[in-house]
Amino acid sequence: MGITSRLKVMSFLQYFIWGSWLVTLGSYMINTLDFTGANVGMVYSSKGLAAIIMPGIMGIIADKWLRAERAYMLCHLVCAGALLYATTVTDPQTMFWVMLVNAMAYMPTIALSNSVSYSCLAKAGQDPVTSFPPVRVFGTIGFIVAMWTVSLMGLELSSAQLYIASGASLLLALYALTLPKIPVAEKKANTTLVSKLGLDAFVLFKNPRMAIFFLFAMMLGAVLQITNVFGNPFLHDFARNPEFADSFVVKYPSILLSVSQMAEVGFILTIPFFLKRFGIKTVMLMSMLAWTLRFGFFAFGDPSPFGFVLLLLSMIVYGCAFDFFNISGSVFVEQEVDSSIRASAQGLFMTMVNGVGAWIGSLLSGMAVDYFSIDGVKDWQTIWLVFAAYALALAVIFALFFKYQHHPEKLSLSTKSLAH
C-alpha cells in the first residue's frame, strides 16, 4: 500500500473515532443516563478545556522527547482506555473527568495527524499543498461513516457508541506503529517557554482590530458546539409526539445530521471564489448569518413534510456557517500577522474558537436548555430562537465594529499559503 493510501486510512480512523460519539453522546446522556442540559454542557466543555491546555504542552513533548508518530500512538491508547471506561460511567461528574482525559489525549492528535501526513508526503517527494486535501477528505468520510454506523445500528442512545470509538482508537494506535518514523524537530536556539506554548501571539491584543477579531472568534466559537451537543437530542425529542415517533428523523437523526458534514465539503470548494469576490469581512458575516439560519430553521423544523425541508436546509447552511468563519478567519490571520509569530497567531485563533469559545458555549448552552425546560420537557423552539438571536446580534455588532478593507490582490497571495 502506497504512503498516500496509508495516510488516508489514518485520516479515516482519526475522524471515525470522533464521529462515533461526538454528535450522539448528548442524546445518550440525556435519554439514557438522565443528565440535565447543564450536565451535558459540562461534559462537552471538556473538549474546549483540552483545546486550551494541550496543544502547547504536546508540542513541547513532541519537540523534546517523542517522535510525532509515537506521540500519536500513545495519545490514541489513552483515548481507547478513557472511552472504554466511559461506558461504565453513570454520573455527570465522573463522566466529565473521564471525557476530559479523553479530550486531552484526542485533541493533540488532530495536529499530530496533520504533521505526520505532511512529513510523510514530503519524504515521498509529493507536494503537501496538493496531496494533503485528498488525504484529509477521508477524515470527513470517516466521520460520516461513523455517524451512519451508530445510527443504522440503533446505538445512538446506547453506551455501545463508546465501545465502537474505543475499539477504533485502539486500532489506530496499533496502526500508528506501522507509519514511517518522523524525526524529532531540530531544537531552535534561544526558544523561550513562552514561544513554545504559543503565547507570544498575545502581543496582538495590543492591536485594536486584532483584539476585536479574536474577541469575535471566541464569541462565535461559543455557537460551534451547540448543535454538536444538542442537535441530536433535539431530533430524538420528536419521539414524544406520537405523530412523529416512527419518523425517519426520530429513527435516524445522525443520518440527517450527517448532511451537515457533506455540506461542509461542498462549501469548502466555494471559499476561494467568495473570499476574492467579497472579501474576508463579508465572508465572516455570511457565516454569522448562516448560523442565524441554522438555528432559525431548527426552531421551526419538525418531521412533517414542510418541517423536514426546514431541517434539511439547516443542515445545508451549516456548511457555510462552519467553513466560512474558520477558513476566512485563518486567512485573515495569515494576511495580517508578521511571519515571526504567524504560527502562534494561528494557534491563538484556534484556541479562541475551539478552546475558550467552545468551553464557554458548552456551559452556557447547557444552562439555557435547562432554563427553557419544564419537568424535563424542553421548549426547543425558544431555545433555538435564543441561539439564533445571539448569532444575529453578533453579525450586527461585527459589521459595525470590525474594520477591514478588501484587497483582492493581497488576498490571493494569502490563500495560496492557506493549504499549508
What are these regions (language model features)?
Residues 1, 180-215, 240-245, 418:
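Juxtamembrane intracellular "pre-TM" segments in multi-pass secondary transporters
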Residues 63-76, 276-288:
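Cytoplasmic membrane-interface "Motif A"-like loop-to-helix N-cap segments
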Residues 6, 85-89, 169-181, 355, ...:
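Multi-pass alpha-helical transporter architecture, strongest
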Residues 100-138:
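Cytoplasmic helix-loop-helix junction between adjacent transmembrane helices
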Residues 12, 82, 92-112, 116, ...:
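Hydrophobic core of transmembrane alpha-helices in multi-pass small-molecule transporters
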Residues 152-168, 367-391:
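A membrane-interface helix-boundary motif in multi-pass transporters
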Residues 77-91, 289-304:
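C-terminal ends and interior cores of transmembrane alpha-helices
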Residues 1-48, 209-245, 252, 326:
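Helix-loop boundary and gating motifs at the non-cytosolic
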